[in-house]
From Swiss-Prot:
This is Hemocyanin, beta-C chain unit G. One of its GO terms (molecular function) is oxidoreductase activity. Belongs to the tyrosinase family. Hemocyanin subfamily. There is a cross-link at C66-H68 (2'-(S-cysteinyl)-histidine (Cys-His)). Disulfide bonds join C56-C65, C166-C233, C320-C326. Keywords: Copper, Disulfide bond, Glycoprotein, Metal-binding, Oxygen transport, Repeat, Thioether bond, Transport. Cu cation B binds at H176, H180, H207.
Amino acid sequence: DIHTTAVAGVGVRKDVTRLTVSETENLREALRRIKADNGSDGFQSIASFHGSPPGCEHENHSVACCIHGMANFPQWHRLYVKQWEDALTAQGAKIGIPYWDWTTAFTELPALVTEEVDNPFHHGTIYNGEITTRAPRDKLFNDPEFGKESFFYRQVLLALEQTDYCDFEVQYEISHNAIHSWTGGQSPYGMSTLEYTAYDPLFLLHHSNVDRQFAIWQALQKFRGLPYNSANCAIQLLHQPMRPFSDADNVNPVTRTNSRARDVFNYDRLNYQYDDLNFHGLSISELNDVLERRKEKARIFAEFLLHGIGASADVTFDLCDSHDHCEFAGTFAILGGPLEHPWAFDRLFKYDVTDVFSKLHLRPDSEYHFNIHIVSVNGTELDSHLIRSPTVQFVPGVKDYYEK
């Protein structure tokens, strides 16, 4: 069942901006208790699921267990938020993990994580004694494309537009990366690092929202009459147990017995729900209309075949005409690091470059090239050849959606 009605209570995830004072204090007290718990359901143990210290292996090398760049990314993180949520509930939390809807334009991070006095959500302590910090980048608060809607809103709309699960997954995951990169910035112990991101409690709000976007896409798929609790791609991968949830020493029986990605498309099995599945005030049917209207206009996409580069990095790219007159074309982020599990997408990440083609008076069959700039989160410029130059696809507009 896809939930659309407003609800509240244990296992219900609310918009972080709608939390009551008592709900806020209840969550903070539960997190305080988790931080004081040195056992298998405590802060250090669950935070380590994602990154460092590495708990998984690949070709005889220790790697982080978190899954990125693969079709089971949504489900691994769906289970991970559930792991945190059940630990909070066991420590007295009366609601689920709230979500931070970063697709709505914002000028500051949620108060739940920024208030400094007696606030366990402000930062986390890492096993090595370091404290998580945040160094937000300017483009987190100011649209780098200067668009009519927020940068993140446009990126997620393109993800929600996809009707194939694996196409959706690529757009969805890369959109989520930018929040990691742009909230953590150059902090060596924070959201922009694969190894330490889960030690920052902001991670919980971010990934509650990321999972909600997955739930909204599933509701859209159901409305479209398309598969929403299964996929017709990456079949073998979606049948594989995901560690560390499948490990015998996982103390959470729900995540342990539902450790395959195919098991948790249907999140009713995990006993949580969202207060609603509206997107910017739109019902699922209204959202579908918005997505269909976007298809009426012809569009041009730069399409990247992405893979791991062993680092977290910001990517910007320019479009240049035959006279080397260049204009900023777009930006996205990669989440990775020395402990990453090797990954490579087999689907293209699409980026709408219609406006910049128009600005340079170019057509898809004109003479042009792209310049790619890759900067790691520590500020080091990386070799631009780490990412292959994108191909370009012209998608004709569909004019007859509303014609009777």
